[in-house]
């Protein structure tokens, strides 16, 4: 049995076959990128009716971008994982995609919307890194634009010991994913194991470990306001963890 490991911290790895399996696994769990992109575009337009451009930070394999391109004249992405970015580039050959870190990127232009979805923000290690990322988001959004962030669970909403499991099959490959979540200080530790099987490949085993910070709602709001953005939290969202929206030019406002 082959064994590989990818460990994600503030620089989440998401490399090798884990990156290749990413979309198959999450779509098998019911993630609907098309619907999420449509809802996200509607949210952006609610705050910025003339929005024409969007930057997706931590764009992963570019699944959201593929659908967002139908709603905005210009879409760009930023991704830390080189392997995830390579998949995104294959999927979105006409989009400009950047290899970079949400804590310190500088693209030299602004967008109608800056988004960071699927709780990618949780890979940051603490308040200083969260503040740095929101400052970068604010620096890349137009004065009449909007910043949208999907958080990880708040501490009071996290379920220690949570186990998730599922099996998906596509193109002759079967993947079973099992994860276990535990509390590790002010963060979630998620251990994930995959069994991947196919007629010609046999069975391989892969595992990854992620530490995802359990920021409080107040910590997110502090980062938004420090970056000069008003902030509003909306319950629900794509994964049930809610969404934060921020508008430029209203430092210190929380709604």
UniProtKB/Swiss-Prot annotation:
A biological-process GO annotation: methylation
SUPFAM superfamilies named in the record: S-adenosyl-L-methionine-dependent methyltransferases
Enzyme class: transferase
Keyword S-adenosyl-L-methionine: yes
Domain of life: Bacteria
Membrane spanning stretches: none
Comment, domains: His-123 is a strong candicate for an active site that hydrogen bonds to a water molecule which in turn hydrogen bonds to the C-3' amino group. However, it is not conserved in related S.venezuelae DesVI methyltransferase and its mutagenesis does not completely abolish catalytic activity.
Name the UniProt record assigns to this protein: dTDP-3-amino-3,6-dideoxy-alpha-D-glucopyranose N,N-dimethyltransferase
UniProt source species: Streptomyces fradiae
């Amino acid at each position: 049995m082959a064994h590989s490991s990818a460990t994600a911290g503030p620089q989440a790895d998401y490399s090798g076959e884990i990156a290749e399996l990413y979309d198959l696994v999450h779509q098998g769990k019911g993630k609907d990128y098309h619907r999420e992109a449509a809802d996200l575009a509607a949210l952006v337009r609610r705050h910025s009716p003339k929005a024409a451009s969007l930057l997706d930070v931590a764009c992963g394999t570019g699944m959201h971008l593929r659908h967002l391109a139908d709603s905005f004249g210009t879409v760009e992405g930023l991704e830390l994982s080189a392997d995830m970015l390579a998949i995104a580039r294959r999927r979105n050959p006409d989009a400009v995609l950047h290899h970079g870190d949400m804590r310190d990127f500088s693209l030299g232009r602004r967008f109608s919307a800056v988004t960071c979805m699927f709780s990618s923000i949780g890979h940051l290690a603490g308040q200083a890194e969260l503040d740095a990322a929101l400052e970068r988001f604010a620096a890349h959004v137009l004065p009449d634009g909007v910043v949208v962030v999907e958080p990880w669970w708040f501490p009071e909403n996290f379920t220690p010991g949570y186990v998730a499991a599922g099996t998906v099959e596509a193109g002759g490959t079967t993947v079973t994913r099992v994860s276990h979540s535990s509390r590790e200080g002010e963060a979630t530790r998620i251990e994930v194991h995959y069994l991947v099987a196919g007629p010609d490949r046999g069975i391989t085993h892969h595992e990854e470990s992620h530490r995802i910070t359990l920021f409080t709602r107040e910590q997110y709001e502090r980062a938004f306001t420090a970056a000069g953005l008003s902030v509003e939290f909306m319950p629900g969202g794509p994964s049930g963890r809610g969404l934060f929206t921020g508008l430029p030019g209203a430092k210190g406002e929380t709604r």
